[in-house]
């Protein structure tokens, strides 16, 4: 084997990293282009917009019947280990468009930089930048587009900023957690905007449990964290991945008043329960809703099945 073929990280069937810096993503869903009036979702439209030189987003708008109506706005962070997939690819896109149709909400799905080409905290910073960009639309009207060319008319016309939500799955839910911690300390748009609530589906944390974890949890979860943030202070006990670590910020400081946390039927459930317990003991004063699905993580994204549709309705009901 030549030196150029020597691997330093191999997690089949998803990703392989070579010693010379090359990255092979072995399993990826296809790109989906922007579209208007999608017939599969009753008229959901989506488009892609730049936010900065390194951050962009896909914005979704459900079919509008009343142009004076204001809709909840959701900022979505996708999962897949901080290092796979995209806001523009079918795996997460298909689910988001169906969620938008069910919840009748605007969604901003953030395209952040991936590891290992861009190690954490790059994705955390990108998602915060995207959230601040969304918040910058508050108080604007359509005439603002003449002078604010970086703003989006769908958000200006239809977003109800009193119903701003975050939403993420797996590592995306981890980004939601860290964004909530940050929003409890730093203001959005100078304090003009507050996050009402957040959905954390299958949140990705590394919290020590008393139960025996599977090889998947022990190896794959920890491997993704090491790949994404190899120099993380504290390693697996870094507060960004372990919210119960000694030096972790107080969960009572979450910058929202409503939370939906969902679990599925695998070994990560024990970790999620410990996270919920820590949140409840923190004294956080918000409304907590827990969805305990007797299913597997990937079933949520198989939108042709009744299982996925029922799970989607449960999560979307939190927004509605």
Swiss-Prot record:
Kindly state the tissue distribution recorded for this protein: Expressed in leaf epidermis.
Consequence the record notes for mutating residue 224 to F = Normal activity
Any one GO CC term of this protein is: nucleus
Q: Name the pathway it acts in.
A: Alkaloid biosynthesis
Question: Can you tell me which residues form the catalytic site?
Answer: 170 (proton acceptor), 266, 297 (proton donor/acceptor)
Alphabetized UniProt keyword annotations:
Alkaloid metabolism, Cytoplasm, Isomerase, Lyase, Nucleus
Known Pfam families for this protein?
Abhydrolase_3
Give me any GO biological process, just one: alkaloid biosynthetic process
Task: Tell me where the signal peptide lies.
Answer: none
> Chief localization class?
cytoplasm
Q: What is this protein called?
A: Tabersonine synthase
What gene is this protein a product of?
A: TS
